[in-house]
């Protein structure tokens, strides 16, 4: 069975897409990032939650501060990438639910009045949105390098509001020389899918 999406687009988004470890110097513009967001904001979440927050690290001073919080192996590529984004979850996302989920505005108080519940929902749904963001970067013809090797608390204190939880840092740009490690294997269908 074939998929509806054109095979070239499937390759761009998944089969040929790789996590880049080196990048060219070509800038990533605000217009490109906005086009990516304007596409991926339509990805589904529970209750149409939109807890993902994206902090673009552009200035040399901010980049230096971020690199200090990255794991040693992630520092050179984070310093060299044309653009770096900190993806975080806004734990006060529920304040926007009356606007984003208008057919049930009471969802804000009915389901998310307790902080632990809110934090769990924010992390789960922002992680979904982060995955859409990575695919959106690929759809723009760019490479993404998502990383979780970092001092999360240090990044939160340095860059984020108190109510935001950092999820990952993503390097973004055109892949440079020797950008890829060898492709790692993936689990086969039968290892993942069961029928009951």
Swiss-Prot record:
Q: Which UniProt keywords apply?
A: Flavoprotein, FMN, NAD, NADP, Oxidoreductase
Name what cofactor the protein needs. Answer: FMN
What InterPro entries would the database entry show? Nitroreductase, Nitroreductase-like, Nitroreductase_HadB/RutE, RutE-like
Source domain of life: Bacteria
Q: Give the enzyme's EC designation.
A: 1.-.-.-
What would you give as a GO molecular function for this chain, any one?
Answer: oxidoreductase activity
Which Pfam families does the protein's record reference?
Answer: Nitroreductase (PF00881)
| Keyword Transferase assigned | no
Cystine pairings recorded for this chain:
none
For the protein in the UniProt heading, the enzyme class is: oxidoreductase
Q: Which Gene3D superfamilies is this protein grouped with?
A: NADH Oxidase (3.40.109.10)
Q: State whether keyword Transmembrane helix applies.
A: no
Tell me which family the UniProt entry assigns to this protein: Belongs to the nitroreductase family. HadB/RutE subfamily.
| NCBIfam families, per the entry | PRK05365.1
Q: Which PANTHER family match?
A: MALONIC SEMIALDEHYDE REDUCTASE RUTE-RELATED (PTHR43543:SF1)
* Name of protein: Putative NADH dehydrogenase/NAD(P)H nitroreductase SCO5049
Which organism encodes this protein? Streptomyces coelicolor (strain ATCC BAA-471 / A3(2) / M145)
